[in-house]
Amino acid sequence: EFQHIDLNQTHIRLTTDLKNNNLEKYILNLRKELEHYITKNKDFQLSLEPVNHDEEDLSEIIKRMYTASSYCDVGPMACVAGCISEMSLDYLISKKSEYSIIENGGDIAIVNNKKAVCGIYSNNPILGNKIGFELKARKTPLGICTSSGKIGHSISFGYADSVTVLSKKASVADGLATKIANEAVGQNSEYKVSNALEASENYKDLFEGVLIISQDNVGSIGKLPKIVETEEFNVKM
């Protein structure tokens, strides 16, 4: 059963084993810190590439966004949704959660002490939206983030149906999904997948696996969970 948290542009679906978690208050504080910083730092908000800074006394969300941005060669705001998911999950884990799934606009952070199925929203006419990752139980967090040149409101310069990245940190998965999706260009879907895979090679240390879908071509790199055909999901992107 999902709990919904809606705060301005943050729309979260939450499944957790914690009854009284106060997560909404925690996310509200994250958003306040972010909004306060953005008002004074327009480059942080608008840049499409990493931003140099020399400040030391930064709030945790700003630090993590700067770090993920520099790892992934994208602007800090390309990592914001994944970062909020990641920090929300860390907060729940600090409260002793062993099973929590946070989905923030398609960017997921999960810890699951039992099997879970995460739907892949590709908007692909052949696959439909009936495939998902079967995630084995694990005690450490996982980020699963998707970027698309065809759906969603994020900026993408590529044309893949979807690029899904799995990484230990959702902030990094979010930034990498954007970066790799931007490289999904070419004269046909085969070229798009090939170019995106080539771009992924530069970031192998940062992810567990990448899945790229473009029309009738699919490519993957790294280690992905088992992909299953189903309509029964614990969470959808």
Swiss-Prot record:
SUPFAM superfamilies: ApbE-like (SSF143631). InterPro entries: ApbE-like_sf, MA1715-like, UPF0280. Transmembrane segments: none annotated. Belongs to the UPF0280 family. HAMAP family: UPF0280 (MF_01079). This is UPF0280 protein ORFE.
